Swiss-Prot record:
Protein's recorded name: TBC1 domain family member 3L
Cited SUPFAM superfamilies: Ypt/Rab-GAP domain of gyp1p
UniProt cross-references to Gene3D superfamilies, sorted A to Z: putative rabgap domain of human tbc1 domain family member 14 like domains, Ypt/Rab-GAP domain of gyp1p, domain 1, Ypt/Rab-GAP domain of gyp1p, domain 3
Residues in Rab-GAP TBC domain copies: 101-293
Miscellaneous note of the record: TBC1D3 is encoded by a collection of very similar paralogs with multiple copies of each paralog, some human genomes encoding well over 50 copies depending on ethnic origin of the donor.
Region (Disordered): 350-423
Organism for this UniProt entry: Homo sapiens (Human)
Domain of life assignment: Eukaryota
Record carries keyword Lyase: no
Keywords attached to this entry: Cell membrane, GTPase activation, Lipoprotein, Membrane, Palmitate, Ubl conjugation
Length: 549
């Protein structure tokens, strides 16, 4: 028996053991559970959201009692909207009531209607069961899924018991989605998102809600997880534009301290929506996000910048990422109604200034052609030395800013043999970063975090190990290859020196004294193990690779 067969049998046995523990139920096969021990009595230790507390809860305050009475009075209004959904689904009244808050007993049916889960179930009868069984037999990430399930919402009464009912349902959903969407497969954030759906939806409904959330253009959440998704880069550019125009002092300080790309709150945007804040505020933000769509992402980050403006201007280069993440989470440690009030005001202000994220437009009926790309309306990155261009005329069918190809600016002209001249262009606002479009068929070069939906599919098989990336599979990440400026000049130079080209093919890779490994993480503080993957705060560089890497 060779090594491959031994490894395959070992993985199959490990997968069967994990599945068997969940089938047996609560705390099966674990003599010592590292997680919190479940309570046997939950008399006065559980709040209205289902969070289990260590001590007995105090009596309700006058404000909490008033909020409960308010939810009861609003229930009839939400029931009326669900009964006449065609009338209210695109109305302003739905948005207004979403900011005020959904009653808890209405949240499940409303999420199901917003994500159209019933229609998906009717179109795909029995498919969830098929995907679930296939995932049990052939999942490649079942160990990671099991580890993440064990740490998801453990303070909630539904997920308190190890190998309990809700943990088993969460495992089944993640295994089924890995088989349903191989492009995304499994990412760490998906366990938190699916757990939120399981709080209010049955197992199969929660699965189709997850499918619809990542597949919908309205929410654009797959761009955070897909290898070719450009949501992160588009939000980064849009955020830098909005902050530079509304808070120039804050952006100027970040440019001065070289914090433009390192301290972006978008790196922990997913964590803010699913982890790190109170469950009540998380659900309120999810309500707004499901109703408003991707437009709500930018106002959320803008509020954090506005609240933390004074602290940001005092942030130095020493450990900026860890300090900023802590302060960004502290932004939400306040009253839920106050946060939603500021969020609504920020949404209106950005809409007036045309700084919000435009909702995806619907193409013309009967036409399968792609939507036209509008002129840039302030979507380019504004860093030191850049000036804001006047807004262009809007197109008939606008689309999200990150779906458009980045504007190109000429950088240099390189003479090549035969009299031809190649003009190197870069996206505006990313001067100094080579164009990823040149990476096709070119020599190997440095790695840059740069992605656009209009880019061709590039190799993303980077496999990095280390303390920073212990639980994250970079084959499912958004890292792409780009060519350094030196490598762009290599084809012309090798054409003039054919002997050197042959000699360089057999040259050994260089080993720098300050690089013990091929990759070096530039993040000054590792991501917290409880957070999602920080997609915007890392920067990797490679040493010179041997040919054929």
């Amino acid at each position: 028996m060779d090594v491959v067969e031994v490894a395959g049998s070992w993985w199959a046995q490990e997968r069967e053991d994990i599945i068997m523990k969940y089938e047996k139920g609560h705390r099966a096969g674990l003599p010592e559970d590292k997680g919190p021990k479940p309570f046997r009595s939950y008399n006065n230790n559980v709040d209205h959201l289902g969070i289990v507390h260590e001590t007995e809860l105090p009596p309700l305050t006058a404000r909490e009692a008033k909020q409960i009475r308010r939810e009861i009075s609003r229930k009839s209004k939400w029931v009326d909207m669900l009964g006449d959904w065609e009338k209210y689904k695109s109305s302003r009244k739905l948005i207004d009531r979403a900011y005020k808050g959904m009653p808890m007993n209405i949240r499940g049916p409303m999420w199901s209607v917003l994500l159209n889960t019933e229609e998906m179930k009717l179109k795909n009868p029995g498919r969830y069961q098929i995907m679930k069984e296939k995932g049990k037999r052939s999942s490649e990430h079942i160990q990671r899924i099991d580890r993440d399930v064990s740490g998801t919402l453990r303070k909630h009464i539904f997920f308190r018991d190890r190998y309990g009912t809700k943990q088993r349902e969460l495992l089944h959903i993640l295994l089924a989605y890995e088989e349903y969407n191989p492009e995304v497969g499994y990412c760490r954030d998906l366990s938190h998102i699916a757990a939120l759906f399981l709080l209010y939806l049955p197992e199969e409904d929660a699965f189709w809600a997850l499918v619809q959330l990542l597949a919908s253009e309205r929410h654009s959440l797959q761009g955070f997880h897909s290898p070719n998704g450009g949501t992160v880069q588009g939000l980064q550019d849009q955020q830098e534009h909005v902050v530079a125009t509304s808070q120039p002092k804050t952006m100027g300080h970040q440019d001065k301290k070289d914090l433009c790309g390192q301290c972006s709150p978008l790196g922990c945007l997913i964590r803010i929506l699913i982890d790190g804040i109170s469950l009540g505020l998380t659900l309120r933000l999810w309500d707004v996000y499901l109703v408003e769509g991707e437009q709500a992402l930018m106002p959320i980050t803008r509020i954090a910048f506005k609240v933390q403006q004074k602290r940001l201007t005092k942030t130095s280069r020493c450990g900026p990422w860890a300090r900023f993440c802590n302060r960004f989470v502290d932004t939400w440690a306040r009253d839920e109604d106050t946060v939603l009030k500021h969020l609504r005001a920020s949404m209106k202000k950005l809409t007036r200034k045309q700084g919000d994220l435009q909702p995806p437009a619907k193409p013309e009926q009967g036409s399968s052609a792609s939507r036209p790309v509008p002129a840039s309306r302030g979507g380019k990155t504004l860093c030191k030395g850049d000036r804001q261009a006047p807004p262009g005329p809007p197109a008939r069918f606008p689309r999200p800013i990150w779906s458009a190809s980045p504007p190109r600016a000429p950088r240099s002209s390189t003479p090549c043999p035969g009299g031809a001249v190649r003009e190197d262009t870069y996206p505006v606002g990313t001067q100094g970063v080579p164009s990823p479009a040149l990476a096709q068929g070119g020599p190997q070069g440095s790695w840059r975090f740069l992605q656009w939906n209009s880019m061709p599919r590039l190799p993303t098989d980077l496999d990095v190990e280390g303390p920073w990336f212990r639980h994250y599979d970079f084959r499912q990440s958004c890292w792409v290859r780009a060519i350094s400026q030196e490598d762009q000049l290599a084809p012309c130079w090798q054409a003039e020196h054919p002997a050197e080209r042959v000699r360089s093919a057999f040259a050994a890779p260089s080993t720098d004294s300050d690089q013990g490994t091929p990759f070096r993480a530039r993040d000054e503080q590792p991501c917290a193990p409880t957070s999602g993957p920080c997609l915007c705060g890392l920067h990797l560089e490679s040493s010179q690779f041997p040919p054929g890497f």
